[in-house]
Regions:
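Polytopic alpha-helical membrane proteins, predominantly small-molecule transporters/carriers
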Residues: 1-119
Length: 119
């Protein structure tokens, strides 16, 4: 497989895993506030989803390490996916606008990811 394509696929596994994990966390937080009586049913659904997310994360870590040969790049890619996905999901699900500190933190995270990938 093409090295660049393999790296992209490996990072995509990380992004999907982080996205599913964050989504399940936010769904249970949002819906628990709406209906505390159905917490157990919601917990079971989100437990299954976060288990799938864990599978994607494991696959993402093993393929990313194989592709990049550097665990630090894998860690940065994982953190970067969280920095991008979590604010998007938070805004989509909760309709809350980020604070200036959140925006600055996201910008610095993006800069850090770019620096780690280049050097």
């Amino acid at each position: 497989m093409n090295s660049t394509l393999f790296k992209i696929l490996a990072v995509m596994f990380l992004i999907v895993g982080e996205s599913l994990a964050i989504y399940s966390e936010m769904i249970i937080a949002r819906n628990y506030n709406l209906s505390p009586n159905s917490l157990f049913q919601l917990f079971l659904k989100m437990f299954i989803l976060i288990t799938v997310a864990g599978g994607f994360l494991l696959l993402g870590y093993v393929t990313s390490y194989s592709a990049f040969k550097n665990i630090w790049i894998v860690s940065v890619a994982s953190i970067m996916s969280i920095l991008i996905v979590e604010p998007v999901l938070a805004w989509t699900m909760f309709k809350q606008i980020p604070t200036i500190g959140s925006i600055i933190g996201l910008a610095l995270g993006i800069i850090g990811f770019i620096v780690a990938m280049i050097f």
